[in-house]
Amino acid sequence: MSSDESERTVSVKQEDDSLRPKRKKTNRACNHCHKAHMTCDSGRPCKRCIQRGLDKTCEDARRKRKKYLADVPNTALLPNRLQQAETYDGTNASPTESGRSIMYQATTFQHSSTVPISYTNSINDDIYSLGFSKSHNSFLPRNQNQTQPLARSQSTFSQKQSTLPQTHSNLSSSRRTNFLSSAADLEYSTLSSILQDNFMHGNHSTSNEGTPNSITLSPALSPHALTTTVSSNTNTGTATRNMTTPDDLNYTSKRNKPYVAGSSQTPSPQDQLSNGSMEAKARISNASASIYDHQRYPKCDESINQYFLGPTESDQVSMFPDVITAIETMKASDPSVFYERNSKSALSFTIGIVPDDNHYTKNHDSVENESFYKEPEEIYAKVKKPFSYTPGYHSLIAYLRKRFNKPMLVKMAESMAAYRPSFIACTNSLKEGDLIFMEQCFQRTLLTYDNFIRVSGTPTIVWRRTGEIAYVGNEFCILTGWSKEELLGKQRKFIVELLDDKSVLEYFQLFSRIAFGDFLGATMTECTLLTPKTDVKIRTGCMWTLKRDVFGIPMMIVGNFLPIL
């Protein structure tokens, strides 16, 4: 073949390609084209599947599950659901469908203490069976889209209403994520509602479910419960469902002001119903105030079962052992109050932040000022002699002999014998200047840690390698009930005095392993803390961090404790 003929053939092929219509790209291929890596079209079934006889099984290929959809049920991500969501927009959406979704979701959560979650197919079927058709797309005027469907399903709704909350509560109990604050619960429910509305109901607009402006807000997260009133019209045979939102129950709202005799204002039927519901709520709140008397029981946020610890503005201090004792007393003397609070949420505690001029803060700062340096220059100027660890060891041995029997003392001595030779070998070569520098490093490190401990909110205590307590955080005093005067006074206490017998033995065994073992020196364990009340012991999870000086010798142990509830 000559060059002219080859060029002519190439030109003919190019002309054919230019005349051939370009195939449009599709956003999503079908399952068969996706497996074969072939170009697909937007039709279902696509042309390629029709030619191959696979038109009956041609559907959108499943996409990889996104990480942010981890808590969305699988039924919400089926291809047919996604296809409906893609074809569903504001132009073909029915006002009655959006209206029924709002009305019945609010009804379901009216007597529920859980965060709103997505419906499953079974609940959706129950809702649609109340007289609504899934394919019902007829347009109605805005003032009729909530009245006519209810007229057709009023009798059926009364039968189904009692079963929906029970079914929903069973599903929500296994899927709800609990947080220790209503703010976190509300934020989580809002984010979940956005995802679930987009994929389950085909709604691509931002959902406000679970927010203060939404009528589907859970009563557990709202200061007011939702009120639903039904008024019937015998002439037309229609029922109107008036949803009262938390905003509608505001006492400062003009619409809900009570009627004043002699005024020109005439109360409407809606105002009368709203005022009646507010009066009922006022009676309930007054009864609750008499039951949940803070003078009788510790201060508590009853909506999330969270008790307040620490100092208050009235210079009253709520210690953890006192609150635990009060809760046990409540459980024995007033079980109805106890079980009502615990049925709402798991038991939790919070520590308040008080101003610096509080009486409690001033007393604790006065104790710290006597034995704690505030500036680095003060450390280098006043620390002129080494810290003597010998009296501390003698006092520790004397205390252990008074408290423990001989078998336990032998086990403790075995643990001490494991690290004692290493201590002697490391300190023999140190001069007096080195020992002074070692103490300066201790105080300087303690000053640095104080800045973090004050803002951490975690009960923290610091002790030397001998076990002598050197620093105590305010939260640790609130947790155990010990005061800083008792722990940091002239007669210093040892950390073993705050632990029960088993925890003391475990402490020495653990210290012998990390003293010259892992250089990081951090470990997690459990221990039982003793309180000034001999009958109250606190089981805690603790994190012990061993800090070494420049010579590699264990200098201090930082202990963080959290109660196991």
Curated annotation (Swiss-Prot):
Q: Does the keyword Transmembrane helix apply?
A: no
Biased composition range(s): Basic and acidic residues: 1-20
Residues within the DNA-binding region(s): 30-58
The UniProt regions of compositional bias labelled Polar residues, in chain numbering, are: 262-277
Query: A single GO CC term, please?
Result: nucleus
In this chain the PAS domain maps to 445-518
UniProt KW keywords: Activator, DNA-binding, Gluconeogenesis, Metal-binding, Nucleus, Transcription, Transcription regulation, Zinc
Which SMART domains does the entry link to? GAL4 (SM00066)
What segment(s) does the record annotate as region Disordered?
1-25, 139-175, 227-279
Q: Which GO terms describe its biological process?
A: carbon catabolite activation of transcription; carbon catabolite repression of transcription; cellular response to starvation; gluconeogenesis; positive regulation of gluconeogenesis; positive regulation of transcription by RNA polymerase II
Quote the subcellular location field of this record: Nucleus
Q: Which SUPFAM superfamilies match?
A: PYP-like sensor domain (PAS domain), Zn2/Cys6 DNA-binding domain
Family annotation (PROSITE patterns):
PAS, ZN2_CY6_FUNGAL_1, ZN2_CY6_FUNGAL_2
MF annotations from Gene Ontology: DNA-binding transcription repressor activity, RNA polymerase II-specific; RNA polymerase II transcription regulatory region sequence-specific DNA binding; zinc ion binding
Q: Where is the composition biased (Low complexity)?
A: 227-245
So what does this one do?
A: Transcription factor which regulates nonfermentable carbon utilization. Activator of gluconeogenetic genes.
Q: Which family does it belong to?
A: Belongs to the ERT1/acuK family.
The record's PANTHER family line, in alphabetical order, gives: TRANSCRIPTION ACTIVATOR OF GLUCONEOGENESIS ERT1, ZN(II)2CYS6 TRANSCRIPTION FACTOR (EUROFUNG)-RELATED
Q: What is this protein called?
A: Transcription activator of gluconeogenesis ERT1
Native source organism of the sequence: Scheffersomyces stipitis (strain ATCC 58785 / CBS 6054 / NBRC 10063 / NRRL Y-11545) (Yeast)
